[in-house]
Swiss-Prot record:
The species this protein was found in: Prochlorococcus marinus (strain NATL1A)
Gene designation per UniProt: rpsE
Assembly description: Part of the 30S ribosomal subunit. Contacts proteins S4 and S8.
Stated name of the protein: Small ribosomal subunit protein uS5
GO molecular function annotation: rRNA binding; structural constituent of ribosome
Annotated region (Disordered), positions in chain: 1-54
Length: 208
């Protein structure tokens, strides 16, 4: 007689079947929904990043004197803009060029300036900016004129979306000072409507 208490090793206990349960299905649904949401966020982030353009104005090798001697690094001046009225200038330092440029881009996006543009992709009024020993004068121009500027000033104006403008550099020729002076000039621009409101007059009086 065989012992009825002995069970065959091939027998599976109840509840250990390989069939998926309702809880497993719910977990898979949650996971798929999370992946979809994450995918949409990634696409939105990529679209935002694709709007911005980056141009390196200058890369220099700099040194810092420390206790053990001189520490060499790279400094990158980067202009960031979307050609739709937003532009920024950033500076980044790192031990390699790629790291310096990456930091410069991040710094530029932290110091963005909104530029009021006219229908002709120009600026509404004349403006002057100064940084250190550099001074920049920018004035509106007629359609078809183009960007009459040079160096880092031209880069700032182009990435801001300005297509018709005249610019004159005075004083220092340093790329960083000129770029920052151009940023100061752009930050002081106001639309005709805002100017009329500040002065307490009508738009007709502004144009007259």
């Amino acid at each position: 007689m065989t012992d009825s208490n002995n069970q065959s090793p091939n027998k599976k206990t109840s509840g250990s079947s390989g069939a998926p349960t309702a809880a497993d299905g719910r977990q898979e649904n949650r996971r798929s929904r999370g992946e979809k949401r994450g995918g949409r966020r990634d696409r939105r982030g990529q679209e935002r990043d694709s709007e911005w353009q980056e141009r390196v104005v200058q890369i220099r090798r700099v040194s810092k004197t420390v206790k053990g001697g001189k520490k060499m690094s790279f400094r990158a001046i980067v202009v960031v803009g979307n050609e739709k009225g937003q532009v920024g200038v950033g500076v980044g330092k790192a031990g390699d060029v790629i790291g310096a440029v990456r930091k410069g881009v991040a710094d530029g996006k932290k110091h963005l300036v909104r530029v009021p543009l006219t229908r002709n992709s120009s600026i509404p009024t004349l403006s002057n900016g100064r940084d250190g020993a550099a001074s920049v004068l920018i004035r509106p121009a007629a359609p078809g004129t183009g960007v009459i500027a040079g160096g880092s000033i031209r880069t700032v104006l182009e990435l801001a979306g300005i297509k018709n403008v005249l610019a004159k550099r005075l004083g220092s020729k340093t790329p960083l000072n000129n770029a920052r002076a151009a940023m100061v000039a752009l930050s002081e621009l106001r639309t005709h409507k805002a100017t009329a409101k500040e002065r307490g007059i009508s738009l007709e009086q502004i144009y007259s």
